[in-house]
């Protein structure tokens, strides 16, 4: 009886480890090969879109798209959450947004001070779009931006072309509200989290 339970428990553990390996495999092939985006933006609920990034570290193959690049569409325009890891990745996201809606991007929100959230800022600023981030995220990017940029250039090589450091143009401490007529977006700082200046957007 005990032997059978041991075999069953071992079988369950092996099955769980196989499932975990499949779900968390860092070598999942690029899901959107004709774009610098790792995956194509999907509308999860009405007006809320996200291009889900790779689950592994940033590489040349995933163009540094290892976070979620999201956007909210409205009659007033589009709000983007996360600028992308480079100018080329930001442009790839913008190209997809233009296929979905004929409205301008009116704001980009950096969810924190990490490279994949902020290094695409220069592209958006060149388009005339204001960039919002928490004050701690801006300080993180001010202090460590050159190293963050150099790391990205190291793995992204030619895909880093045109990317330069560009700080957010709007900062906030606790809460920032974006009123889009029939839609209100709140950027909230809820305290220390994954990295300096991490915020929630809802």
Task: Annotate each language-model stretch with its function.
Residues 16-34:
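Bacterial Sec-dependent signal peptides at the C-terminal "C-region" and cleavage site
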Residues 43-48, 75-78, 177-186:
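Beta-strand-turn-beta hairpins that frame and shape the catalytic cleft
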């Amino acid at each position: 009886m005990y032997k059978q339970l041991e075999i069953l428990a071992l079988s369950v553990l092996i099955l769980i480890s196989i499932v975990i390996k499949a779900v968390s495999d860092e070598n999942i092939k690029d899901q959107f090969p004709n774009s610098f985006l790792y995956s194509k933006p999907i509308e999860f609920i009405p007006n809320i879109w996200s291009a889900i990034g790779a689950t592994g570290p940033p590489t040349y193959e995933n163009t540094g798209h290892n976070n979620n690049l999201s956007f909210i569409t409205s009659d007033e325009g589009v709000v983007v959450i996360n600028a992308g890891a480079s100018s080329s990745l930001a442009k790839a996201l913008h190209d997809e947004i233009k296929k979905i809606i004929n409205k301008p991007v009116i704001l980009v929100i950096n969810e924190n001070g990490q490279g994949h959230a902020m290094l695409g800022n220069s592209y958006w600023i060149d388009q005339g779009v204001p960039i919002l981030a928490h004050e701690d995220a801006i300080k993180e990017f001010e202090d460590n931006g050159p190293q963050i940029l150099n790391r990205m250039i190291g793995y992204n090589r030619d895909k880093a072309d045109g990317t330069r450091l560009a700080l957010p143009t709007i900062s906030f401490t606790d809460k920032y509200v974006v009123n889009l007529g029939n839609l209100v977006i709140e950027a909230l700082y809820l305290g220390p989290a994954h990295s300096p200046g991490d915020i929630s957007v809802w």
